[in-house]
Amino acid sequence: MSYKEEELKEFASQLAQCMENIDQFMVIYLIGNLGAGKTTFARGFLNFFGFDKVKSPTYSIVETYETENKIIHHFDCYRLTNPEELDLIGIRDYENQNCIHLIEWPEMAEGIVSSPDISIQIDGENDLRDINLNSGSFIGEKIFSCLDF
C-alpha cells in the first residue's frame, strides 16, 4: 500500500479507531529509516484520540497521552545507547490495561520492549510511503479485520 502524507495520517487514524474499544495492553512497532514517516504515522494515530499537538519523543524518549479510557505512550528509541535505558525509566510501569505503546525504532530496544501486536514498516521518501503490516498476535489479527484496506 502506498500513501501520501495526509493519507498516511488518515490510515493511522483508522487504525486508532479499530483499537479504541479494545480493553487490553497493545503494542505497535513503527519501523523505517529516518524521515520515513514514523512520527507522522504516530501523529495521525494520536489525532484520532483528540491530540492536535503531538511532538516527537526523540529527546524525551517517551511522551504520554491520556484520554478518558486510553493511555497512549509514544516511545522513540532512536537515541538509546543501551536497551536497558528503558528499564531505568521504568518501561514496565507503562504496561497497563487500556494502554497502547507506539514504539519507533523498536530494534534499538530489543529484548526490553514487549512483542508487537502489530508491526508497521514504512518505506519511501518524497511524496509516497509504502506500508507493510504484520500481525504478531491474535489481537493484531482482530485489529486487521477491522481495517479498510
Please place each PLM-identified region on the residue numbering:
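Short phosphate-coordinating micro-motif centered on Lys-Gly-acidic
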Residues: 81-84, 92-149
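Short beta-strand-centered segment that lines the nucleotide-binding/catalytic pocket of NTP-utilizing
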Residues: 51-66
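P-loop (Walker A) phosphate-binding loop of NTP-binding proteins
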Residues: 31-33
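Phosphate-binding P-loop
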Residues: 18-25
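Conserved lysine of the Walker
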Residues: 38
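N-terminal pre-Walker A segment at the start of P-loop NTPase domains
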Residues: 1-18
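Short hydrophobic/aromatic beta-strand immediately N-terminal to the Walker A/P-loop
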Residues: 27-29
